[in-house]
From Swiss-Prot:
Disulfide bonds: none annotated. Residues 42-69 are annotated as: 7 X 4 AA tandem repeats of S-I-N-Q. Involved in extracellular lipooligosaccharide (LOS) biosynthesis and virulence expression. Involved in the synthesis of the oligosaccharide moiety of the LOS molecule by adding GalNAc. Pfam families: Glyco_transf_25. Between 2 and 7 copies of the SINQ repeats are to be found in different strains; these are thought to serve to generate phase-variable expression of this gene. The (SINQ)n peptide may form a random coiled structure that permits appropriate interactions between the N- and C-terminal domains of the protein. Changing residue 151 to R: In strain: DL42 and RM 7004. Sequence repeats lie at residues 42-45, 46-49, 50-53, 54-57, 58-61, 62-65, 66-69. The gene is lex1. It is an enzyme of class 2 (transferase). One of its GO terms (molecular function) is glycosyltransferase activity. Changing residue 274 to D: In strain: RM 7004. Its EC number is 2.-.-.-. This is Lipooligosaccharide biosynthesis protein lex-1.
Amino acid sequence: MSAIENIVISMENATERRKHITKQFESKKLSFSFFNAYTYQSINQSINQSINQSINQSINQSINQSINQSNSILHNIEESRILTKGEKGCLISHFLLWNKCVNENFEYLKIFEDDVILGENAEVFLNQNEWLKTRFDFNDIFIIRLETFLQPVKLEKQTKIPPFNSRNFDILKSTHWGTAGYIISQGAAKYVIEYLKNIPSDEIVAVDELIFNKLVDVDNYIVYQLNPAICIQELQANQSKSVLTSGLEKERQKRSKIRKKKTLKQRLTRIKENIIRALNRKKWKEQQRIKEMQGKEIVRFM
């Protein structure tokens, strides 16, 4: 079965974000549906809530079936001590849609988050399906990443899949954060669900770390990076001028401040780095930038 229209994950009460999404998609004459994001509570309350939070009745039926089949995954995610509450809710929201893709036999799903900004000619990619069907087998395990996080990443050029609308399908070979926009094949949805079924709760990671980092080097699992990208998170595009607050980002920043106790070697290395920075801050910054960029590039947004 062909996929449904573009799905945007959004909390039901996120008024400003929903206005933002409506403006973005309507400006491109794109149809879309909101998927009410999973709100972290106790697992039993959340399951009952999730059944009622959906795009339409058919999706409710799919979610009900998915939950009945996947309680172990939901409980594992809830028990994770690594993830913040926001990260748990985000992962489960994406997971429920992957389950929908499999249970309703969709060839693929186009999934977005409610802080996405769409670029030039995004409608050509998101309104049409022929370019997808002529280039990809949806039984294969692949994700097409439509987004850039504007971070240095390793990309492998390939010639098997031709460009479309002057954008290449490069193969992602390193971490690339964010899940604001991607297309997942049914084959990939099955693979990621099966992966989650077979790992303990202490190995569960955030959704972007899972599909765009942890699995990137796995054989037969391919992430195609659309290059240049057709979408970006509003926070990444506008930085300090961002108007859409992110509770998830605040949680992550708070967690990053909780530092682990360092070894003597690590402390001495840090002291050395501080001295170098103090003596020649500009030179040190340039060295760090060059080191980070070796063999990498920043995927442009346009």
